Amino acid sequence: MKEVVIVSAVRTPIGSFMGGLSTMPAPRLGAIAIEGALKKINLDPALVNEVIMGNVVQAGTGQAPARQAAIFAGIPNTVPCTTINKVCASGMKAVMQGAQAIALGDADIVIAGGMENMSLIPHYVQMRTGTKFGPSTLIDGMQKDGLVDAYDENAMGVCADACALKYNFSREDQDAYAIQSYTRSSKAWEAGKFDNEVIPVAVPQRRGEPKMITKDEEFTNVFIDKIPNLRPAFSKDGTVTAANASTINDGAAALVLMSREKANELNLKPLAVIKGYADAAHEPEWFTTAPAKALPKALAKSNISIEEIEFFEFNEAFSVVGLANMKLLGLSDSNVNVNGGAVSLGHPLGCSGARILITLMNVLEQNNAKLGAAAICNGGGGASAIIIERV
């Protein structure tokens, strides 16, 4: 099989809920990320063989969101496009499917990533059969199709509370983790550690010039001193709060994948090699710990031991996700999410799987490290993981 390399990878800033990116539909955000990834290496869009983009709550975005993103980015109409929905792991699964296409010889150049605008997710009302008596009920599309377990109809946070109880993580443990995430992301931005991965977004305004969004918005919204005083968000006696959980966000990320041969032919320097990847799943209510199942599978496929991995990125759907998976895998937080994670940076559902991979690539570069692993849980009890080697 062909070796798969990453030659370009960028993301938009992550916008807060109803924040700076809230008026930009997901396909438009995806287009900005795709165009940015292509421009970074001066790659002709006509050379792209396929586009695969993750997008979770697609209601209201129009037909074929990935196709829209590709066309808006200047990709020719002749290039096939696919939209992936693996809930929070959608962006990572898109990269995995792109890598598979290249490895098997079905493509030489694939753009893969993810996108989400949670601010624009609509409410639903069942009007096909009419309401014979009484009021109709509006259903929040974000809640129904993004943030609630389909089997027991509990919010994802209820599962996080159960995880904290099972693995003995206190409210204080989770708050400390959240504070560390905010501290790390703030310091990383101050040190310019996100400059290479984030591209600006010009947001059209009703009047005047577009507003430029150049930085993640979420990490500046917190009041650290208030974190210990927040009420439980999901269960009466729970320990998960709005502050130690990830937030509702908008954003997009895109990577350009190539076969090693094609990168050499085009004189493009690979940034990283995809060494292996894997999915795993168990009971839906324990989705929080599924990364601890997916990561060992990806490592085994890569013939790499966990001790050889120098830096890890776990998607912080909740603080307890980071804590529990570190505990299960025997990891220290010294090399996990060193530039902060989704608790502080934000979690645009379809984007996050690609976002953590892009962040990992930059962390490896910044620390002159070689091997990294990224893993992300997803609703329904699943997870995905990727192992990369910096070139």
PLM segments and residue spans:
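Active-site pocket-lining segment
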Residues: 158-161, 197, 205, 275-344
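Flexible glycine-/small-residue-enriched beta->alpha junction loops
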Residues: 109-162
